[in-house]
């Protein structure tokens, strides 16, 4: 009886331990996968600096293209699409945090004019919902509804991201006006090279922090290298730690200069930013334009009819 109780107690302990480990894994996995936009959100009050540079470029060092497509003009209180395209070669593989190769993820930030915001789900058409898919958008700050971020998401599926945007109504929002507004966008593909604290990720190259001879190279069990550089003048040693991912370019006995690359650069992604323009159109102005065009068309019709009538009169007079 005592043996059965002992086994039961051990079984309970093992079950609890496994449950705790699974919970920790799920929490850490979720926080890592959703951390990339949060890096910028935690570090910067505004994602666009005074110089016009979007802060994502501080971590994603390679420059890559990005494109935005918006309507030329929209009416107040109207849902429209802002399409952000993040082009890249879908065959490329990036270095993951564990040093293995995997597909590229993408992310984007769109900075709208004040008053413009993410459209609520009940205002979306079925076609727009289909384009959006399973994307989850969030505001950069709770009080900054005009700045929207998304990602990281799989690049093969979402290299084109559709943002559903709701235009403001100046009749209900005093800060909104019928004007032409700029829209700014930033988009990245792949992991960054630098973390917000300034440390390097394993998705970049590493260089020597001292000149000297490579006296020892140790390949770590979990990947990566430990390189010992010995200064020939005073035998001072510097140990360089290389994480798993970048490929080693140096060998033992080789003399290195200061800042000489120790590894290749595995980065295949990059960040880009662009801009567009949109006009918040006054409906009365549109109605006035339509009325003017209708008046012009009617005037042209009357002129044609009058001309034909005049020609008939002339023809009748000539026959007399």
Swiss-Prot record:
One Pfam family from the record: Apocytochr_F_N
Keyword Nucleus part of the UniProt annotation: no
BP GO terms, sorted: photosynthesis
Keyword annotations of the record: Electron transport, Heme, Iron, Membrane, Metal-binding, Photosynthesis, Plastid, Signal, Thylakoid, Transmembrane, Transmembrane helix, Transport
Keyword Iron-sulfur belongs to the record: no
Major localisation: plastid
Cofactors named for this entry: heme
InterPro entries, sorted: Cyt-f_TM (IPR024058), Cyt_f (IPR002325), Cyt_f_lg_dom (IPR024094), Cyt_f_lg_dom_sf (IPR036826), Rudment_hybrid_motif (IPR011054)
PROSITE patterns: CYTF
Topology of this chain in the membrane: Single-pass membrane protein
Gene Ontology cellular-component terms listed: chloroplast thylakoid membrane
Subcellular location as annotated: Plastid thylakoid membrane
Cofactor note: Binds 1 heme group covalently.
Signal peptide: 1-35
Membrane-crossing residue ranges in chain numbering: 286-306
GO molecular function, one term: iron ion binding
Binding site for heme: 36, 56, 59-60
Role according to the record: Component of the cytochrome b6-f complex, which mediates electron transfer between photosystem II (PSII) and photosystem I (PSI), cyclic electron flow around PSI, and state transitions.
Similarity-based family: Belongs to the cytochrome f family.
Subunit record text: The 4 large subunits of the cytochrome b6-f complex are cytochrome b6, subunit IV (17 kDa polypeptide, petD), cytochrome f and the Rieske protein, while the 4 small subunits are PetG, PetL, PetM and PetN. The complex functions as a dimer.
PANTHER family in UniProt: CYTOCHROME F, PTHR33288
Protein name: Cytochrome f
Record organism: Cuscuta exaltata (Tall dodder)
Organism placement in taxonomy: Eukaryota, Viridiplantae, Streptophyta, Embryophyta, Tracheophyta
């Amino acid at each position: 009886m005592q043996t059965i109780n002992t086994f039961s107690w051990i079984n309970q302990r093992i079950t609890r331990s496994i449950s705790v480990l699974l919970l920790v894994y799920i929490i850490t996995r979720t926080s890592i996968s959703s951390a990339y936009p949060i890096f910028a959100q935690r570090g910067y009050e505004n994602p666009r600096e005074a110089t016009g540079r979007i802060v994502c470029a501080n971590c994603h060092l390679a420059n890559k293209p990005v494109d935005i497509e918006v309507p030329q003009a929209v009416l107040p209180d109207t849902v429209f699409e802002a399409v952000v395209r993040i082009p890249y070669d879908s065959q490329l593989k990036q270095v993951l945090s564990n040093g293995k190769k995997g597909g590229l993820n993408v992310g984007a930030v769109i900075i709208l004019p004040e008053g413009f915001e993410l459209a609520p789900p009940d205002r979306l058409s079925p076609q727009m919902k289909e384009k959006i898919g399973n994307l989850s958008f969030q505001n950069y700050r709770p009080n900054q509804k005009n700045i929207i971020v998304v990602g990281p998401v799989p690049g093969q599926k979402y290299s084109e991201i559709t943002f559903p945007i709701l235009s403001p109504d100046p009749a209900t929002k005093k800060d909104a006006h019928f004007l032409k507004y700029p829209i700014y966008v930033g988009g990245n593909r792949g992991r960054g090279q630098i973390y917000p604290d300034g440390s390097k990720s394993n998705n970049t190259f590493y260089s020597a922090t001292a000149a000297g001879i490579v006296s020892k190279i140790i390949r770590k069990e979990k990947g990566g290298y430990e390189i010992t550089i010995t200064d020939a003048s005073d035998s001072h040693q510097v140990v360089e730690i290389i994480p798993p991912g970048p490929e080693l370019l140096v060998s033992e006995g080789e003399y290195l200069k200061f800042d000489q690359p120790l590894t290749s650069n595995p980065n295949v992604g990059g960040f880009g930013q662009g801009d567009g323009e949109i006009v918040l159109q006054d409906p009365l102005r549109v109605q006035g334009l339509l009325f003017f065009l209708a008046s012009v068309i009617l005037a042209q019709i009357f002129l044609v009819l009058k001309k034909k009538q005049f020609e008939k009169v002339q023809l009748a007079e000539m026959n007399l």
